[in-house]
């Protein structure tokens, strides 16, 4: 069975890992980095992903960042003169990760385990699956990020029982999961979180502070200047990272804008104390989900054995201190917060292929599921933190006499009223025989699969008529749209491969021209005029082809030059070899001559005493 890669598709950074033997290994990207910025930019018809896209974000308005925050919504982003769904942009990131994983493995990759925040709802999970499909990946499993982290942490600890709290603060989302580990079983007891809290929010606090201070000093609002705003974002992210290691950092942005008197520069120092003050409310928001998860799991703090920190934002000192204060425990630092999720996803891939034995993952649904009933009430069928996969049925009836149909409004959330929860979908069960209210028996069944994706059916127990719906992400992507996006993604991959081939050919041409010119110079006056002239002629032809930019012509002329240059190099080698042989012959003769002038050799005799 081919390898199943593990992908952590993050808000700010993504990572890909693979199982090698029993070890989960992070695959470095083409720039040698173990994580890849989740950034996509468009330039001259080319799609650029990762580090290169992030570097040009300041100057290129066609750059998309933090697309994960829009997953599961119908919101689109404009770039490159087109509108893209969040799934399409995410697919470009996935395709890039898939591409360099294939380069590393030396084989095609068709399957992946992709992680999502534990608190992602059904629409967001479905959108992630769609993104994988567009990227040409069969998504074998959607795994919650804290669960994947626990899997990576606990793989070598299957011989002991422990309860762990995973505190996962990423670029755009926050999750807390409590798991029980023992005998190879990873059992999620409870999960809680906030899909609108992450490192981006900490950056935004710094940006708002810088904008406000600059406006006070110069009367100019930098938030209205798109390019200045991108520079501020980069500076804020850097300052945040700096303040994890030092107590004060300098923010210096020359020529940030221009005033009536000329160019203006932003120079400001930011202390850790000020940063902590700016972000105090964000840190406070992490405490409620911790308490909620503990309460749902029915555990006290004293029963938690380890606290695992996941996500780059857990490096913020104030966050670490808040975790210590809230749990009364020193966080376990045995895992890399940026890499552990992808590594856990790769381990789950190994479980699916059978390469990892005796490991069972029992995950939960993060939010309650149910339907709208009379009076706009939300009636739960499946409570949050129920182990998945699961199925649950309940019988309802009509609200009016002779009601011919019932509308099934499927919801996800925790609020008592339907209007306050997330709509997953609606469908109708029709042709209900005329009867007084309360008589027809309508059985509603919810199914949640191992990926946390929901399907619902309604059945009239009197007529056995049934209606079924698989909840689609409310981005509204049909199978046809996904297929079209897949074809577009494949076409882009082919175009990218062709562009790479062009660049490689041009580099080869440059190299061949340089090497041949060097050889021609070195062979001047050495008597290889025929070969030198042939090489020079082929070199001139290649230079003409290079100027024309005709790739086929360049390829043909490069082959011709390589042939002539090789013939010249052979002559040069033969001459060097002959000279070396002659020199060795002369040394041998001289050595023999000096030996003949020495004393004659005489056999000696000796007598034992």
Curated annotation (Swiss-Prot):
This is Chaperone protein DnaK. Coiled coil: none annotated. The keyword Transport does not apply. Induction: By stress conditions e.g. heat shock. InterPro entries: ATPase_NBD (IPR043129), Chaperone_DnaK (IPR012725), Heat_shock_70_CS (IPR018181), HSP70_C_sf (IPR029048), HSP70_peptide-bd_sf (IPR029047), Hsp_70_fam (IPR013126). It comes from the Bacteria. CDD domains: ASKHA_NBD_HSP70_DnaK-like (cd10234). NCBIfam families: PRK00290.1, prok_dnaK. Keywords: ATP-binding, Chaperone, Nucleotide-binding, Phosphoprotein, Stress response. Belongs to the heat shock protein 70 family. One of its GO terms (molecular function) is ATP-dependent protein folding chaperone. Acts as a chaperone. SUPFAM superfamilies: Actin-like ATPase domain, Heat shock protein 70kD (HSP70), C-terminal subdomain, Heat shock protein 70kD (HSP70), peptide-binding domain. The lineage of its organism: Bacteria, Bacillati, Bacillota, Bacilli, Lactobacillales. The modification Phosphothreonine is found at residue 173. Residues 578-595 have a biased composition (Low complexity).
